[in-house]
């Protein structure tokens, strides 16, 4: 079984040297309950939040910016990822498992969405670095066309990096697992874990940390009353990414060591198995926070949610005329406020998009 996929419910024992059996039955049962509940919550909140981002960007009447392109692709990556969670929930509670084609396809979507989401978070960090720290030099490159080209490259990279994770996946006796060739059985799981640790965590974290550190240096040198909020949001982005993904990646690293029998005691193996189930769910729930951190903290997304709320209220309360009139007034007021806000930021960003600071 891949390290980031739900563990099989039928593998209740693990065997080691001297034919010693390590009973995992209670850990598997507890992990199954935990995974089913939290995967369902992550799916529900992740689906709603990221769909709102997609609808807000598509329905926005303003011209699209490069930031919008990246936010849209981040939301699509998260949607692709959370769309697989009901299948894994079904897998851990149903003895029939998944059909071969479904097993292969869902595993592929899972890892493409997994790496795609992290890669787009990293790209957004680099884009903000270019927009704020290198504003003058990057102005001509930060176009929508450039954003589309970069996004296609990120998707290609996500597919390429995800391929080793699902290329050997198959269904056998109601189990969806990695069936590696004999020559690769020992080294391939190590390669997969190392790929997740490095390309899925360490490298993105280093890039994000550098970009946001340089951004904060630039903001501290600017005399602007909005910079305190921007710095808090930047700090939030890095801290949330670190807190949600670090425990899981530590467990993946310990699991790699376990492949070399660094933890011979059964109790340690049991604790590690449970810890992976807990920390992976915490890490996966990060996709529920992406809309809040990257999108809804921006003015345009709050405006969209407000308009959506008023439309729903109009339908429920049967006062469409009144709400339409007040909405037009508030839209005019928001437009004036937006123009003032935009002018406050254009002196140190290359596109004047306030969301670039989030």
Swiss-Prot record:
Pfam families, per database record: 7tm_1 (PF00001)
Signal peptide stretch: none
Extracellular-facing ranges: 1-26, 90-105, 169-186, 254-275
PROSITE patterns registered for this protein in UniProt: G_PROTEIN_RECEP_F1_1, G_PROTEIN_RECEP_F1_2
Disulfide bonds: 103-176
Membrane-crossing segments per the record: 27-47, 69-89, 106-126, 148-168, 187-207, 233-253, 276-296
Cytoplasmic-side segments: 48-68, 127-147, 208-232, 297-358
Biological process according to GO: adaptive immune response; antifungal innate immune response; brain development; calcium-mediated signaling; cell chemotaxis; cellular response to lipopolysaccharide; central nervous system maturation; host-mediated regulation of intestinal microbiota composition
MF annotations from Gene Ontology: C-C chemokine binding; C-C chemokine receptor activity; C-X3-C chemokine binding; C-X3-C chemokine receptor activity; CX3C chemokine receptor binding
Keywords: Adaptive immunity, Cell membrane, Disulfide bond, G-protein coupled receptor, Immunity, Inflammatory response, Innate immunity, Membrane, Phosphoprotein, Receptor, Transducer, Transmembrane, Transmembrane helix
Locations listed in the record: Cell membrane
UniProt topology in membrane: Multi-pass membrane protein
CDD domains, per the entry: 7tmA_CX3CR1
Primary location: membrane
GO CC annotation: external side of plasma membrane
Modified residues (Phosphothreonine): 349
PTM notes: This protein is not N-glycosylated which is unusual for G-protein-coupled receptors.
Self-association state and partner proteins as the record states: Found in a ternary complex with CX3CL1 and ITGAV:ITGB3 or ITGA4:ITGB1.
Similarity-based family: Belongs to the G-protein coupled receptor 1 family.
PANTHER family: CELL ADHESION MOLECULE, CX3C CHEMOKINE RECEPTOR 1
Protein role: Receptor for the C-X3-C chemokine fractalkine (CX3CL1) present on many early leukocyte cells; CX3CR1-CX3CL1 signaling exerts distinct functions in different tissue compartments, such as immune response, inflammation, cell adhesion and chemotaxis. CX3CR1-CX3CL1 signaling mediates cell migratory functions. Responsible for the recruitment of natural killer (NK) cells to inflamed tissues. Acts as a regulator of inflammation process leading to atherogenesis by mediating macrophage and monocyte recruitment to inflamed atherosclerotic plaques, promoting cell survival.
Annotated protein name in UniProt: CX3C chemokine receptor 1
